[in-house]
Regions:
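Thiotemplate assembly-line natural product biosynthesis machinery
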Residues: 1-18, 72-74
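Phosphopantetheine carrier-protein modules
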Residues: 10-28, 47-58
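Residues in well-ordered alpha-helical elements
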Residues: 3, 18, 27, 37, ...
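C-terminal structural segments of small proteins and small subunits
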Residues: 40, 48-52, 56-74
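Amphipathic alpha-helical interaction surfaces in cytosolic regulatory modules
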Residues: 33-39
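General helical structural elements
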Residues: 8-10, 42, 64
Length: 74
C-alpha cells in the first residue's frame, strides 16, 4: 500500500517517488491544499475508503496519510 500511495503523491507533486519520505513536510515540498485534496480523493477511490474532511486538515506528511488509510480500513 505504501508504495502505491508514494506513487500517487509523487505524481501530483512532480517529484521522484524517492523524495516522498515518511516525515517530509508536504508544505516544504510545495504541496497546497488543493493538491492534497486531489491526492486524498485518488486514495479514497483506489482503496474504497472515506476520509473525513476534518481528518484531512491534520495531514502534514506521508506518514499521516498512511495512518489515516490504516484507520479507515479498520
Amino acid at each position: 500500500m505504501e508504495d502505491r500511495v508514494r506513487e500517487i503523491v509523487a505524481g501530483y507533486m512532480g517529484i521522484l517517488v524517492s523524495e516522498v519520505t515518511d516525515d517530509g513536510n508536504f508544505i516544504e515540498l510545495g504541496m497546497d491544499s488543493l493538491t492534497l485534496l486531489k491526492i486524498i480523493i485518488d486514495i479514497e477511490n483506489e482503496y474504497d475508503i472515506s476520509i473525513a474532511d476534518e481528518e484531512i486538515v491534520d495531514i502534514r506528511n506521508f506518514a499521516d496519510i498512511c495512518k489515516l488509510i490504516e484507520k479507515n480500513f479498520s
